[in-house]
Amino acid sequence: MKRLITTWFITFCAACVAWADTYEMPGFTFSNIDGGEFNTDDWRGRPILVVNTASMCAFTPQYEGLQQLHDKYADHGLVVLAVPSDDFNQEKDNAVEVKEFCTVNYDITLPMTDITHVKRGAVHPFYEWMNRTHNWTPRWNFSKVLIGPRGQVLGTWGSMVRPTSQKIISPIQASLAM
């Protein structure tokens, strides 16, 4: 009996260690709007809020809430990643215009990608992965995905849910153990 319990305990511990080392999201690379790249592997162990954005949309004022989240939680580990996209025909013509618009109107300092396909055309691999593994595709601009510290999808929200909504803040705080 002692041997059975010991065997069970060792197996259980090994499974726990394997589970703890599992990271669900593959690494993705995004082009940085300022040049260079972002690699999501650099953010392992941190929650990442990924939001497809647009400069000429009724939801564009949500940039303010995204920046507030960045300002409040970045030092605790949260990454807020803005992913400008013209897939819904509401983005500026080029990355320089997007960056200028966001800086002038919203004083954006959070990480921002170059203009990226999220639903149509050459869809970015992150969004392909979300569609394939979680049956999720942005329905409109300012759709949000929260990736947890272990690469797990903690939640998805549409455009109507503001970044500062408790629906988003609660899982962010939980993932930061606040």
Located regions from the model:
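Bacterial N-terminal signal peptides
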Residues: 7-15
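Short pre-active-site segment immediately N-terminal to redox-active cysteine/selenocysteine motifs
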Residues: 46, 53-56, 84-87
